[in-house]
UniProtKB/Swiss-Prot annotation:
This is Uroporphyrinogen decarboxylase. SUPFAM superfamilies: UROD/MetE-like. Pathway: Porphyrin-containing compound metabolism; protoporphyrin-IX biosynthesis; coproporphyrinogen-III from 5-aminolevulinate: step 4/4. Keywords: Cytoplasm, Decarboxylase, Lyase, Porphyrin biosynthesis. Homodimer. Coiled coil: none annotated. It is found in: Cytoplasm. It comes from the Bacteria. Substrate binds at R24, Q25, A26, G27, R28, D74, Y145, S200, H315. The record marks D74 as: Transition state stabilizer. It is an enzyme of class 4 (lyase). GO terms for cellular component: cytosol. It comes from Hydrogenobaculum sp. (strain Y04AAS1). The gene is hemE. Its main location: cytoplasm.
Length: 347
């Protein structure tokens, strides 16, 4: 591994600048990605082709110069071996098919049907000059897709089901949690240097609901993986960060990836034992270069001095940004943070 600054930051070792990578860095904004994606009618078929998945995973490292590679896959691939049919409709996102018989979902021995994920990680571990990130969805985020059977704007079905069918909801969460522990374990054994858990839909929950219905499952997964792989950093990404941060800090993750609803300066000072990742708005990448640099400078200025940190967005890159802007953003983060923080006032 030629560049391990990302791992060093997660482990709070001395670094000369902040590492930077971006959620959805392998995606439609890259012409090089689109050239490969067009070969496949099915998104899942694309994910299952190890050779092409490896190529698009590594593209951001070669093109943008990011400090980590995240495997190209989808959080929903775990559901197929559990017994839930998943398809991706053109322009409409994922569609799931099942009969709500959650007690019969398979939660153990699911790894054999996910061998393409583990083969991809082995290839990336061999070829990548930077640390490799494996990932999965958090139980509640996956449960939301299962209950809604598709993407949702307000998660009404999920919350009604959670409150009215508590027994079945907890059965589903338990099954997902058990499967996730096995899945993450195999990812690490296959070469993942870091694991990121995506809880994208935690933003739909009140603090009470998060603590009552979700928290224990997240804590169980992180504790289980830490017992098996104590030296592998775990990042927990959660939207609605301002609502749930007081609970998330106790989950046991090494780092929290937060959205733009929190002040980085504030959370870094309040929770100095944790590493934070984030949290710029993705829309910044749509600005002209002068304004991109301005936002990067202001952001770096707000990170407390001598704080371990990973620069990222508060959510994924949108397809409408230009490759040049993303590359410039990465360059700015490196340049501004490299030994130049003394040029800027503290927040």
């Amino acid at each position: 591994m030629k560049n391990d600054i990302f791992l060093k930051s997660l482990k709070k070792e001395p670094i000369a600048r902040y590492p930077v990578w971006l959620m959805r860095q392998a995606g439609r904004y890259l012409p090089e990605y689109r050239a490969i994606r067009q070969k496949y009618k099915s998104f899942l078929d694309f994910c299952k082709n190890v050779e092409d998945a490896a190529i698009v995973s590594l593209q951001p490292v070669d093109i943008l110069g990011v400090d980590a590679v995240i495997m190209f896959s989808d959080i929903l691939v775990l559901l197929e071996p559990m017994g839930i049919k998943v398809s991706f409709e053109a322009g409409e996102g994922p569609v799931l098919d099942h009969n709500f018989d959650f007690k019969n979902l398979k939660s153990q021995g699911i790894s054999g049907d996910l061998s393409y994920v583990f083969e991809l990680l082995k290839v990336l571990k061999e070829k990548s000059p930077v640390p490799v990130i494996g990932f999965c969805g958090a139980p509640f985020t996956l449960a939301s897709y299962v209950i809604e059977k598709e993407s949702s704007r307000d998660f009404t079905k999920t919350k009604v089901f959670m409150y009215e069918n508590q027994k079945d909801f907890h059965i589903l969460m338990e099954k997902l949690s058990e499967a996730l522990v096995e899945y993450i374990d195999h990812q690490i054994k296959s070469g993942a240097d870091v694991i990121q858990i995506f809880d994208s839909w935690s933003m739909s929950l009140s603090r009470f609901a998060y603590k009552e219905y979700v928290y224990d499952y997240n804590a169980f997964i992180i504790k289980s993986i830490k017992q098996k792989h104590p030296n592998t950093p775990i990042i927990y990404f959660f939207r609605g960060s301002s609502s749930h941060i007081e609970d998330a800090v106790d989950l046991g993750a090494d780092a929290l990836s937060v959205d733009w609803s929190v002040c980085i300066n504030d959370v870094c000072k309040r929770y100095p034992d944790l590493v934070f990742q984030g949290n710029l708005e993705p829309q910044i990448l749509l600005l002209d270069k002068e304004n991109i640099r301005k936002h990067v400078e202001e952001f770096v200025m707000c990170i407390p001095r001598d704080t371990a940190f990973v620069v990222n967005l508060g959510h994924g890159i949108t397809p409408d940004v230009s490759k040049d802007n993303v590359k410039y953003f990465v360059e700015c983060v490196k340049e501004v943070s490299y030994g130049k923080r003394n040029l800027f006032k503290k927040c």
